[in-house]
Amino acid sequence: MKPEMILFDFGGTLACDPIYNMEEGNSAIFPYITENPHNVTKEQFSNFIKELFDEIRVLRGEFIELHEHIFLRYVLEYFDIKLSIPIEEAEWIICKSLAENVMTPGADKMLKTLTEKGIRTGIVSNLCWSGAALERAMGELFPEHKFDFIITSSEYIFRKPDRHIFDMAIRKSGLKPEKIWFCGNFIEVDIIGAKNAGLFPVLYDNRDIPDRFHKYNDTSKIDFPYHHIGGWGELIEILEK
């Protein structure tokens, strides 16, 4: 059965898995500081963020997400730092400075084909960035494409593979789960998570681009129907059969 909607993961699927420059990204808001009474340096600021985030990652586990606005607000108030810009803009500046978003090969053509075929699209991403930040990033990467909705775990508490975040996407779609496909690059999180929520999984496994999840992906874990594609052209071929 052909899908009425295809949902996508973001990092490693629609966009290449980024290489983050944490210190450069975290210190990118320093030109916008209006008050820094403790004379916190860029290095101190970045190191504190890394240590705090590592602690939070342990506390939250694998299935609950932190929102970047809350995290950044804590850090700024901890150091009594004030900015000349709102927290939303500070988030975007950090996001842009951490890494450059680059679409995976042929993603734009694939999305155009889906639009032409009347197949709706959406994004479900494990991300501490706000949904607004991801929407902004997608607008830059795919200016001619309109997603029905974009869901980040930061806005909806739960992280893939927890079923709740997939259920939210299904509710937003207004469709039955069997009419939706989910494309992702991580078997444990995307493929198994989607299957458990009743969606049809598509493993995006492009070995021509760097992806930190390649080494974790073991297809022997998959004992259910799914599509395994090495590029977006293969997805188009499947849809045109």
Q: Where are the language model's segments positioned?
A:
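Short beta-strand/loop segments at the ligand-binding rim of alpha/beta enzyme cores
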Residues: 120
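Asp-based, Mg2+/Mn2+-dependent phosphohydrolase catalytic module
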Residues: 1-8, 16-19, 39-40, 108, ...
